[in-house]
Amino acid sequence: MIIYVHTAGRPHRQTTIKSFSADLMKRTRLVVQDAEKDKYNIAPLKDNLVVLPPHINRLSPTRQWILENTETDKFVMMDDDLTFAHRGPYTKTKLYQANPQDVEQMFSELEYLLDT
């Protein structure tokens, strides 16, 4: 499963991928507009870049392009400003900030569900 994080105008504020483990980053693609590709040529982002064609500069066409050009049949599209939380083991109401291992577990469970 590939994780696509579409982003624009925030090369130094990547909230979503800050929650990802190194293993999860290997499956993540940061989708950027052609006009901004040089701004995202920074570690750790530069190794995961997917640059859109120059005529695509809005969110809806970006999502459509990802859908039509993905490398796999299982993928997730996410915004670049997400935070993650989970419920604690002894409460059904309190939320706890998720660490990278929690987020990786979430994606593992999602992939398992997509396979069943």
Where do the model's predicted regions map?
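Active-site-proximal specificity loops/subdomain of glycosyltransferases
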Residues: 31-78, 83-103
